[in-house]
Amino acid sequence: PNMDRLVNQGMSFTQTHVMGGLNGAISQPSRAMLLTGRGLMDVHRNGQIIPKNEKTFPELFRENDYTTFGTGKWHSDKAAFNRSFSTGANIFFGGMHPYGNEKEEKGHRCPYLHEYDPTGKYKNGQWVNASLNTFSSELYADAAIKFIETNASNDNPFLMYVAFTSPHDPRNVLPDYGRKYGSKEITMPKNFVTQHPFDNGDLNERDEKLLPTPRVPEQVLAERANYYSMVNEVD
């Protein structure tokens, strides 16, 4: 309902499609394209680095006297983040949260996040001291809420960029709120096949590693149920 309300009160791009990527990361070039307005073949190194000549839209706001705030996933270079945002909190520069095993509380409950560093160094090991029981979405939402509350009475305009990492895998631990879907409520897509129908040059890349092949419908249904549950959790 909250996402629906944002759409109804704002703007929704209903004909937006992922163009693909030049490596296993699809979100990385998509993010760079969204930030710069460039196409897939025009973003630098699949979006790993956003050079100075490719201005991001937060940069343009910042140049026009907006306070720009960023929280959540970035997964491009740190210099571009600091050009784009004058401040931030609970920042994730990686591609995904760490996988764990049945005895470890990892994944979205163990995000490696940085506080905003004006120097742009963001050294590894200097993480936000967050409880392992705090889900990633809560950390990003709390950072955004705190920023709004701090700037509510400020006459200076601001732009806030909030990038949740859920429902990105690993989908290993769910928080105890929001509706949890059961696999019996989820249907398989009509185009489901147990494995890729032809050799595309790399049959063991990224999503193909999430589950063994040939795919078993029951496992796919469980994965899709977790995915929808995490979308509901973000909402």
Regions found by a protein language model. Give the residues of each.
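Formylglycine-dependent sulfatase
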Residues: 1-235
